């Protein structure tokens, strides 16, 4: 420790010369040397020089493997820093701690949890390397959240092994490390500043915002990462601005023109690779912004099971789209944290890509599922090469100098790309109400399912009134869904969703016909059983029959008497015929079955009513597609309203007719029994 103190004093005296700040000190109770801690935080470039200098000194003094730990929060620049070292010293071996994830320990998809790391395997590999043995390093696939294989790692010629990861300076690894390096700042801090700016711009109070950001955006940083970083001997502050990526931009040419796979292969060299990708781009709207005009989205990407945050700062130089291509991995919980701070999911874009890649250029065939479109993309760092490749593919003259989100905004298609991926819903437990309904048809089905489920539940309990109340609530919910998606429907009348809608309508009608046939056969069977009774009905039942046949009796008049398939609180007189009917148990079962069947028919009629209303609205929208002035739109709207009214008539008439038949048959039987 005395030497350590002397080293620190020496460092303070020679503050101006970086190479003199990197000093060795012998470890206590060990023959190995380590680096004296540098108290000042170094810039990215100075830190790189210091680490290279430290590795050189350590390899001169220490025998065997030199273990270097590089740790820091997500987005701080660990991977970039490690790659920079690898480019300078190609003989260095790098071990990523991500490959030591144990999928059985994942909790809520949180890959930042320190308990996730399989330290037993990692420590065994490090000990074997120290002994000069060949090791099998696991390969972890984030898409399947599983270990898919192993790669062989020999002791590198330089004897330097870098361990890179969030917890590379953890207590379990520190005793083995010869050099401890921390990297902080970078996009990690840029995100915090960006979130702070968005929240303040929305008029929120700044008190405790920083604390809230730390707790919600990076919940693991303060608790587990930051304490370990304090033990680093070389501390690097990455002041990297993500938008300095324009110094090495990616040039993109985009087109709707279709090009075959064979054409692409013919243009690219024989050494190209071919892969397929599936990505979800989640565009996060800052507080107070309009989704159709926002130019400052945060974009979170789900690809191969990993989540990354992308800073958007697009520049167009027609026909090129120029992108900084700055991304960094984040925890799956980041989305929930940002939403807790006031961000909302504006758009979710699912993209399936067929990628053809060479060393210098990428050609992609993108399929945007929600928009039902193909796009061609040619990307690369060399502007001239990108342009010549696009021209060879025959894309010249068809370029679209806009990003996908800009194209969506231009065409007012924000609501059409709101399909929330299942894995996000499962891992984040996001409520559907946090985003717009993915489809008005799905909203209709959800409302119908809720309505049918509630009715079945209330049938068992005999709660006809509560069913009516709940139905009104569900209808209001349905109206809310329809209102929020009206613009979507008007734009999407030719979309594949309509095919599914018509198929569903046909299935509902078919099911209704089957139940009507069953109901008719039941009534005929019951009539045959009642034909032996010849007693005439009383005046009261005649008057009731007249009301029912004329349709003047309210629906609740006979529904209230059919709860649970029995005739409680019914319009029947309390006479001896009631007790006789109760004693006739087989016939009572028949009547109960018919009552339940009647209610099931009403279920189908309810669903059919709503589906026909949607179909009528579709027809009215198609009819007014060609209209170009507000007057025509007003008349179409009125026509649509009248169509909706007309579409309700048939289900209402059928409902009243079926209920009338049921009550007439039951009353006839009772009166005859009298």
UniProtKB/Swiss-Prot annotation:
It is a single-pass membrane protein. Keywords: Hydrolase, Hypersensitive response, Membrane, Mitochondrion, Mitochondrion outer membrane, Plant defense, Transmembrane, Transmembrane helix. Residues 484-496 have a biased composition (Basic and acidic residues). GO terms for molecular function: ATP binding; inorganic diphosphate phosphatase activity; kinase activity; pyrophosphatase activity. GO terms for cellular component: mitochondrial outer membrane. Predominantly expressed in the shoot apices of inflorescences. Residues 623-640 have a biased composition (Low complexity). It is an enzyme of class 3 (hydrolase). Pfam families: CYTH, PRK. Residues 248-410 form the CYTH domain. Its cofactor is Mg(2+). Induction: Repressed by the oomycete pathogen H.arabidopsidis. Negatively regulated by salicylic acid (SA), benzothiadiazole (BTH) and pathogen-associated molecular patterns (PAMP, e.g. flg22). Disruption phenotype: Enhanced hypersensitive response, elevated pathogen resistance against both virulent and avirulent pathogens (e.g. isolates Emwa1 and Emco5 of the oomycete pathogen H.arabidopsidis, the bacterial pathogen P.syringae DC3000 (AvrRps4)). Elevated accumulation of salicylic acid (SA) and conjugates (e.g. salicylic acid glucoside (SAG)) upon infection. Stronger systemic acquired resistance (SAR). These increased defense responses are PAD4-, ICS1- and NPR1-dependent. Residues 457-498, 619-640 are annotated as: Disordered. InterPro entries: CYTH-like_dom_sf, CYTH_domain, P-loop_NTPase, PRK/URK. GO terms for biological process: defense response to other organism; negative regulation of defense response to bacterium; negative regulation of defense response to oomycetes; negative regulation of systemic acquired resistance; plant-type hypersensitive response; regulation of salicylic acid mediated signaling pathway; response to molecule of bacterial origin; response to oomycetes. The keyword Repeat does not apply. CDD domains: UMPK_like. SUPFAM superfamilies: CYTH-like phosphatases, P-loop containing nucleoside triphosphate hydrolases. Signal peptide: none annotated. The chain crosses the membrane at residues 650-670. Exhibits pyrophosphatase activity with stronger affinity for pyrophosphate (PPi), moderate affinity for ATP and ADP, and weak affinity for tripolyphosphate (PPPi). No activity observed toward uridine substrate. Negative regulator of the salicylic acid (SA)-mediated amplification of defense responses against both virulent and avirulent pathogens, including oomycetes (e.g. H.arabidopsidis) and bacteria (e.g. P.syringae). Represses systemic acquired resistance (SAR). This is Inorganic pyrophosphatase TTM2. The gene is TTM2.
């Amino acid at each position: 420790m005395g030497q350590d103190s002397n080293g620190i004093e020496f460092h303070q005296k020679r503050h101006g010369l970086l190479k003199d700040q990197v000093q060795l000190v012998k470890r206590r109770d060990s023959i190995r040397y380590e680096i004296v801690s540098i108290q000042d935080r170094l810039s990215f470039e100075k830190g790189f020089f210091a680490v290279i200098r430290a590795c050189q000194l350590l390899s001169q003094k220490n025998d065997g493997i030199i273990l270097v730990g590089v740790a820091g929060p997500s987005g701080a620049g660990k991977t970039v820093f490690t790659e920079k070292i690898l480019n300078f010293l190609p003989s260095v071996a790098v071990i990523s701690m991500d490959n030591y994830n144990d999928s059985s320990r994942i909790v809520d998809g949180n890959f930042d949890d320190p308990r996730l790391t399989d330290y037993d395997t990692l420590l065994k590999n490090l000990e074997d390397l120290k002994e000069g043995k060949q090791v099998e390093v696991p390969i972890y696939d984030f898409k399947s959240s599983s270990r898919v294989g192993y790669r062989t790692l020999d002791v590198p010629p330089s004897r330097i092994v870098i361990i890179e990861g969030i917890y590379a300076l953890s207590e379990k690894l520190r005793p083995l490390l010869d050099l401890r390096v921390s990297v902080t700042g970078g996009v990690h801090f840029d995100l915090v500043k960006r979130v702070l700016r968005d929240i303040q711009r929305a008029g929120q109070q700044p008190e405790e915002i920083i604390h809230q950001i730390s707790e919600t955006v990076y919940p693991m940083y303060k608790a587990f990462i930051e304490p370990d970083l304090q033990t680093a001997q070389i501390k690097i502050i990455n002041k990297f601005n993500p938008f300095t990526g324009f110094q090495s931009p990616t040039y993109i040419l985009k087109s709707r023109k279709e090009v075959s796979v064979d054409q692409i292969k013919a243009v690219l060299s024989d050494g190209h690779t071919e892969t397929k990708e599936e990505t979800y781009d989640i565009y996060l709207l800052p507080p107070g912004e309009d989704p159709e005009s926002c130019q400052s989205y945060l974009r979170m990407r789900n690809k191969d099971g990993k989540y990354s945050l992308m800073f958007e700062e697009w520049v167009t130089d027609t026909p090129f789209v120029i992108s900084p291509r700055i991304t960094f991995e984040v925890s799956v919980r980041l989305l929930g944290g940002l939403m807790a701070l006031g961000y909302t999911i504006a758009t979710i874009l699912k993209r399936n890509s067929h990628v053809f890649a060479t060393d210098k250029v990428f050609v992609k065939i993108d399929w945007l599922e929600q928009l039902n479109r193909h796009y061609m993309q040619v990307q690369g760092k060399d502007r001239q090469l990108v342009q010549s490749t696009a021209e060879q593919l025959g894309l010249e003259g068809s370029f679209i100098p806009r990003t996908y989100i800009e194209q969506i905004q231009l065409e007012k298609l924000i609501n059409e790309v709101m399909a929330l991926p299942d894995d996000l819903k499962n891992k984040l437990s996001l409520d559907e109400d946090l985003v717009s309904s993915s489809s008005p048809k799905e909203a209709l089905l959800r409302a119908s399912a809720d309505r049918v489920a509630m009715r079945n539940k209330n049938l068992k309990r005999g709660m006809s009134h509560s069913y009516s109340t709940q139905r009104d609530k569900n209808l209001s919910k349905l109206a809310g869904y329809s209102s929020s998606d009206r613009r979507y429907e008007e734009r999407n009348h030719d979309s594949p969703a309509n095919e599914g809608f018509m198929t569903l309508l046909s299935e509902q009608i078919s099911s209704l016909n089957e139940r009507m046939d069953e109901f008719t056969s039941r009534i005929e069977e019951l009539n045959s059983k009642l034909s032996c009774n010849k007693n005439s009905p009383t005046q009261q039942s005649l008057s009731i029959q007249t009301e029912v046949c004329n349709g003047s009796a309210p629906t609740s008049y006979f529904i209230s008497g059919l709860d649970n398939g029995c005739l409680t609180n019914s319009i029947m007189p309390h006479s001896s015929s009631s007790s006789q009917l109760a004693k006739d148990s087989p016939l009572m079962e028949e009547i109960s079955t018919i009552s339940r069947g009647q209610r099931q028919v009403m279920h189908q009629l309810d669903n059919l009513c709503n589906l026909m209303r949607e179909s009528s609205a579709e027809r009215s929208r198609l009819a007014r597609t060609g209209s170009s002035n507000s007057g025509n739109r007003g008349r179409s709207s009125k026509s649509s309203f009248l169509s909706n009214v007309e579409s309700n008539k048939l289900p209402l008439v059928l409902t009243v007719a079926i209920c009338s038949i049921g009550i007439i048959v039951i009353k006839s039987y009772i009166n005859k029994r009298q």
